[in-house]
Curated annotation (Swiss-Prot):
Gene: rpl1
GO biological process, one term: translation
Entry GO MF terms: rRNA binding; structural constituent of ribosome; tRNA binding
Family of the protein in this entry: Belongs to the universal ribosomal protein uL1 family.
Entry protein name: Large ribosomal subunit protein uL1
Ribonucleoprotein is among the record's keywords: yes
UniProt cross-references to HAMAP family, sorted A to Z: Ribosomal_uL1_A
SUPFAM superfamilies hit by this protein: Ribosomal protein L1 (SSF56808)
Pfam family, one: Ribosomal_L1
Extent of the signal sequence: none
Length: 212
């Protein structure tokens, strides 16, 4: 991991005005030379951060039986088929659920009903559930997703993502940034040439450029 990333994070933390609340540390990525009107060129990646997100990640699991029981120890909420059907009759409640939840996980057998009752709400938000296969451990899946962020550019050249909190060390935050930048370089059409600039900042602090 380049020392320049650590230096940029340290500056962002040092230059942030003192606050009496815990601040998020965010990354802004500016893209270039991409036709983002073409959906295939857009960024849409889930990335597990090695140092964690530094924030609470809200995860809802759709499950039944033993899987639902196990999920109760890990997820923020566990919903069954009856609750799922109720959301189909209450669009406002469905939208609230989607807006308050970072990630959804669902047993594969429930995916069809989720598409039926919640697809029009979750789909446009990019929040359709991660399907659980029979051999998947729901607790492991939920715990992994607690450290996951979603990179999504849509049709805009600039997008943001959470990379930590201001009480994490510069090295921890820099490690998260390094993983994100490497993933982008590996998946973008022209690799690093498609990245115009990268900035890191706390919620209320100034932006500091992360050198290439």
């Amino acid at each position: 991991m380049a020392d320049t990333i650590v230096d940029a994070v340290s500056r962002a933390l040092d230059e942030a005005p003192g606050r009496n609340f815990r601040e998020t540390v965010d990354l802004a990525v500016n893209l270039r030379d991409l036709d983002l009107n073409d959906p295939s060129k857009r960024v849409d990646e889930s990335i597990v951060l090695p140092s964690g997100t530094g924030q609470d990640t809200q995860i809802v699991v759709f499950a039944t039986g033993e899987t639902a029981l196990r999920a109760e120890d890990a997820a923020d909420e566990v919903l069954g088929p009856d609750e799922l059907e109720d959301f189909g009759d209450d669009t406002d409640a469905a939208k609230d659920l989607a807006d308050e939840t970072d990630f959804f996980v669902a047993e594969a057998g429930l995916m069809q009903d989720i598409g039926r009752y919640l697809g029009t709400v979750l789909g446009p938000r990019g929040k359709m559930p991660t399907p659980l296969q029979p051999d998947d451990d729901v607790v492991e899946t939920v715990n992994r997703m607690k450290n996951t962020v979603q990179l999504r550019s849509r049709d805009r050249r600039t997008f943001h993502t959470r990379v930590g909190a201001d009480d994490m060390t510069p090295d921890e935050i820099a490690e998260n940034i390094d993983v994100i930048v490497r993933r982008l370089e590996a998946t973008l059409e022209k690799g690093p040439l498609n990245i115009d600039s990268v900035y890191v900042k706390t919620t209320m602090g100034p932006s500091v450029e992360v050198p290439a």
